[in-house]
Every structure is written in structure tokens, then in C-alpha cells.
Amino acid sequence: MSDSKEITKVIVTMVVISAVAAALLALTYTPTQAQLKLLQAEQQKEAMKEILPQAADFEPVTGSEVDDDGNPVVLYYKGVDSSGNVVGYVVERNQVGAQGMIQLLAGISSDFSTITGFQVMKHSETPGLGALITTPEFQGQFVDLPVADTSLTKNGGQVDAISGATISSQAVVDALHSAVDYVSAQEG
């Protein structure tokens, strides 16, 4: 009898501890998520300024879909100068890389002829190989690069692939072409 009482006592204790831990986790989750969203929005704004520096402001272009919070989903951003003239576009693209999804922001000139730059926002590429898509040396190749030349050198373009990470390099090129095609179809 005493063994079953001991087992019951241990089980009840574990259930109470688990319930308290779950309650604490639930209490901290919501404020943490809100703070995380604010931080991500700030990082995105900084990245947009870097890849389209001639823009004084970014106007969101939304579609008919809404997110989980009921806000319209942003399709892309129009970069405008201080007079309100469109100087380019910034669009988020997701592309499958060698190890997972690569999420990047692409800057495109207002006439859709030039990549103004890009920033990787998230990735799960191999450290020391595919992760080198985040380096200034790789990303610098795309600053003011004509869209027609936005392909790897092995394919006749002007982009040097990262040695040992051709799939990741090609994924970036594909994402940039997808970005240009998408925005030009929406705006053109």
C-alpha cells in the first residue's frame, strides 16, 4: 500500500510542477513574441535602407489576404524618394537552398533592369559554405548588377559562386530573378 501512495505522490508532484512550468511558459510567450516581431520589423527596415539607399521611405503594397492578426499581407514595398517618386522596389523571397529555406529581401530598380542589392534575413545553410551567402564579399557582387547579368559565371553571368556552395549561390540568383519577375508583373 505504501508503494502505491509513494507513486501517487510522485505523479501528483510531477503533474503540479509541469502545470506550473506550462503556465509560466504561456505567460512569457505572448510578450516575447510581440517583442520579437518588433525586432524583426526593425531589422527588415534597416535591410531595406541598405539595399535601396536612394529611397527616403518605403510604401507597402498589400494584397487582399490578411495575416493572423487581421492585417493586410504586404506583397512588396515601393521605395520612394523625398518627392514621392518611385526609385525602386523591395520584395521578400523564399528560395530552397542546399540545407533549407533561404529568406531574403531583394532590391530592384524602378525600371526592373537592375538588382540594387539583397540581404539574407534567414537561412539554414551550412556554416563555412552556404552560409557565406551572408558575407559582404558575396552580396557585394549584386549591388547595381544588371538583371541580364544576374547569373553564375559558369552560366555566362557575372556572379562568382561560393566554392563548395553552388546550390546556395544558385538559390540566391533564382530568388532574385523571381523577385524581379514578380514585381515587374505586378507593376508592369
From Swiss-Prot:
Q: Where are the FMN phosphoryl threonine modifications? A: T166
Q: Which UniProt keywords apply?
A: Cell membrane, Electron transport, Flavoprotein, FMN, Membrane, Phosphoprotein, Translocase, Transmembrane, Transmembrane helix, Transport
Q: What is its EC number?
A: 7.2.1.-
Q: Which Gene3D superfamilies match?
A: 3.90.1010.20
BP GO terms, sorted? electron transport chain
Q: Which cofactor does it need?
A: FMN
Position of the signal peptide: none
Q: Which domain of life is it from?
A: Archaea
A Pfam match is: FMN_bind
- The residues exposed to the Extracellular compartment are 31-188
- Say what happens when this gene is deleted: Deletion of the rnf operon abolishes growth on acetate and ferredoxin:heterodisulfide oxidoreductase-coupled Na(+) transport.
Which Gene Ontology molecular-function terms are recorded? electron transfer activity; FMN binding; oxidoreductase activity, acting on NAD(P)H
Question: Subcellular localization, per the record?
Answer: Cell membrane
Membrane-spanning intervals of the chain: 10-30
List all topological domains (Cytoplasmic): 1-9
Family to which the UniProt record says this protein belongs: Belongs to the RnfG family.
Protein purpose: Part of a membrane-bound complex that couples electron transfer with translocation of ions across the membrane. Catalyzes Na(+) transport, most probably coupled to electron transfer from reduced ferredoxin to methanophenazine and heterodisulfide reductase. Involved in heterodisulfide reduction during methanogenesis from acetate.
Q: What is this protein called?
A: Ion-translocating oxidoreductase complex subunit G
